[in-house]
Each structure stands twice: as C-alpha cells, then as structure tokens.
C-alpha cells in the first residue's frame, strides 16, 4: 500500500502568485518488494555477482543480499580481502544444506526452525554472524531445556557464544546438579563450564561433599589431561563446610592423587579450619543448609528466658533448651555463620524496655562480646570491643560483624557514639573503621551485600517519646566510606516503630504504626510503597529471608501481647499468616540462622 500527501507552497513573482506542488511518496512494502525481486533474480539465475564454494557444489548469489543479512559477509566486502576481489569464498565447515537454508532465509526473511534443524541453524548463524537467526535459535532451545539435553545445550551455547542460552542452561544445570553429575554428558563437560557451575552459591546439592565427589569423578575420567586442573577446581569446593571425618577419609582414600597434584595440603588446611573455626563460615550453599528464625527474650527480672526457633521449610516452632545467654539490657544480637554474637549492653540494673532504658541516669555499658554455639549449646566470651557501648546495632557484612552507634559508659546526657567497629570471627580481632557522619539514636541496620544501611533518629527523647525517623546513612564496607542519604520517605515515620530488613539485596522497612511496607531504590533514593499487612504490634520483630519478610509478635497495649506471625511475599506482594510463636512476646531478639544439614542441632523428624 502506497501512502502519499501533497504539500502546496505559494510564492509570488512580479506580484503574480504562483503555486508550487510537491508530492512525497512512502511505500510501506517497499523493502518486501525489493526482497521479492531479488528472490526472483535468484530463481531466474540472473545478476549473480558472487559464489560460495562448497565441497559438493558452487552456489551463486548476490553480494548485497549476503552483506545485508550477515555481518560475516559485510565485513568481508568492506575490507580489502582476497574473497572480495575474487568474487567467491570457500566454506568448508558448513554443509551445502546449511548454506542453502541460510540463503533461503536471506532472500525471503522466512524460515522454519524445528528440533531437527535448530542446531544446523544455530551453527551457521554463529559462523555467519546472523544475529536475528541466532537469537531465534537461542529462544527455541531455551524452551526445550530438559534433564536429557541441558548439558549438551550448555556445551553448544558455550561453543557458539550464545550468552542468553548459556545463562539459561547454566542456571538449569546448577539447579539440577545433584541429578546430573553422574551422567556421561557431565564427564564430557569442559573445564571452564564446570568451573562456572562450582562457583555458584545456587549449585543445588544436598551436601558439599557431592561437589568434591563431582570434581574427582570429572578429573579421573581423563586423568592424564585433567589432573592439572585439580588444584584450581578443588578451591571451588567449600571444603570447610565438610566434616573433619569426611575430609580425613579423602586424605586416606585419595592420597596418591592429592599428593601428585599438590592438593594434599589444601585438604590438611581445610581440616585445620574445621577444627578451629567450625560453624564460622557463612558461605554454605543454601541447598546444603536448614534455615531458622531464632527468637530469644529475657524478662525484666533477668531470670525468666524464652528461646525458640522457627523452621522456614516446615512452618514449625520448637522450644529450645535453656541456653543461659547473657543478653544485658541494651545489648545487640547478630548471627554469623552457625553462631550467634551478643555485644555490649549495660551491666547495671537498667530496665530492659527501651522506653525506660534510655531514661536511666547512668549507663554502665560494657565492651564484652559473647558467642553462642547452638550446635554445642555453649556460651562463651570472645575478644572485647574497643569501646563499651549499649543501645547500639550490629550487622554482618563481608564476613565481618559491625557494631554501630549506641552510647558508651556514662551519664544519660552523653552523646551517641560515632565510633564504628568491625569484628573478624576467624582472627578474633576488632578493628576500628570510619566513624558515622553524625550521631544517631535507635539505629536500625541492614546489610545488602557490601552496603550497610543505617536508619534512626537524630534526637534521643521527644515530647511524645517517639522521635522521628530522620537519619539515613549508607556505608560501603568495601571502601570503608559513609555517606548520608536524603530520607525521602514521603511521609512521617517514628524511629522506634519501623523495622529495616534486607530481602534479595533490597532494603525494606516495615512501619508498625501504619502496617505498610516500603522498598528503597538506591538509584533514586526514593521509597516505594509495596503494600500493607493486616496488623502488627509495637516492638514486633521483623526478619527478611529469601524473598519473604516475617513480622513476629509485638504488643498492642502493655497487657495485650501477641504471638502472631505474618509473612510478606515480596515476589507477589501478598501477605499470609503462618504458625504462631509458642509464646506471645514483645521486645525480643530475632535473627535468621542457618546450619549445615549434618550439623543442624535443631533437626527433628517431628519438628
């Protein structure tokens, strides 16, 4: 269909008006018509100016069609190549059938991709650099990924340089690794692809030992040519997540291979790590762990303690044995690996409730740090902080425990601490890092990978007690740099009535006064409303785990405490209620902790 329009222009000559006419023509199917004409030239065998020489035959064609469709041919014709001047090119790595199929597509813009020809099209589109056809093949194969063909497609996409297909197939292989590592196709996997699989946190295996078995099986399949790769691949196995007995067995049973490849000492070092620091490695693959929400509270009298845990997978609660945790008023609790760390607090007779605690005339803050090991139900002191502190916050990032804010030992009117410290559980050392930009009270900290967000108030006590949320800091743990963000919340928040939680590396806050959830966009520094939950008590606990936010307990009034637990599914913006806590609680410690399955102290068939 042709579309045209007239544009009339008027001008005058010697006072006499004359009209100039212009006609603009646009043919919507002009390109298709040219393609049809070129195809007719091909059918009539006329105007050919180039030849593709195959082993079986010579195929004539038109340069303009080749250059328009293939980056390979366009580059050939643009530079001073021998083929350009000779008027022909010899192709030996494609069949005549494949080249003819390419030409059919080039001249018509149409083809049919099937299970039988997709690999042929994939190969030729990769070699001839036909991006549209390559993407079509990639999309076709992505829809066909299965346990039967995934390892073959992974190799295929790696060979032909299809990043999209490789990414989708690698994801599938990683999530079905436990079913694939004994297959014959796995044994043929190339070194680079295997390395990418082993590096992933998402590698789906029931225990880390399976990863070590897979590496050794792959090496032994072609020992002479592959044993050189063992020193590199074995570092991708998280050996410190294996038990000491398992590692000792491998030293005994694989002694010759390990020594001949200089890997024996790597296993020995891993055994030393397990002996000295078992449970202090937070890099366990999610599929090898069991995840829990840990709850602990000591009553105001300092004697009655309640400790229980919630199994994420089974939606079940379990009351834990008496742990005798020393959680002083104003202390902070954080999980790290399979351990729980308690820092600081007041040694005096300060009240535990935050409203009363802040008003104490003197804070006898301590620098002590304690570690609780649930696997052994042991509680012990570790290295003390550099500065005594209470009413602070703590958070884990980059395999270090950071303590932020709070007040040190002294009278009630002393200012908030600017000092920030980090603790390395492996070296057992505290280090001072860059201080806060300014003082902050009621700090809430959340870590999103290497970024720590801290929210709170610039005042300690307001007329109505609830100070406004007006401090928002960002700390880059990699560069040791603080920055102050503009708190564009869009509405008023109380610093003591919000809970900050990370979900999939995104910061969320839950407002316990309005029952609303907001997510933070670091690029725009804007908070976005994500929905509302049914209700929540003041002083509730909040936890982010996987793609969910759990809100637990709290109080609606001094004599109205709840045991309710609500879950927000961020992926679908929905709330649901799950099993209630064994006891109604308010103002309690709440942390996520995970255990390697073979070390899980809270596992029970009847959990």
UniProtKB/Swiss-Prot annotation:
Residue ranges constituting the BACK domain according to the UniProt record: 150-250
Keywords: Kelch repeat, Repeat
PROSITE patterns xref list: BTB
InterPro entries the UniProt entry points to: BACK, BTB-kelch_protein, BTB/POZ_dom, BTB/POZ_KBTBD3, KBTBD3_BACK, Kelch-typ_b-propeller, Kelch_1, SKP1/BTB/POZ_sf
Entry-linked Pfam families: BACK (PF07707), BTB (PF00651), Kelch_1 (PF01344)
SMART domains for the chain: BACK, BTB, Kelch
All copies of domain BTB, residue ranges: 48-115
Membrane-spanning segments: none
Gene3D superfamilies in the record: 1.25.40.420, Kelch-type beta propeller (2.120.10.80), Potassium Channel Kv1.1, Chain A (3.30.710.10)
Spans of repeat Kelch: 291-337, 339-390, 400-450, 452-502, 548-595
Ranges in a coiled coil: none
Protein name: Kelch repeat and BTB domain-containing protein 3
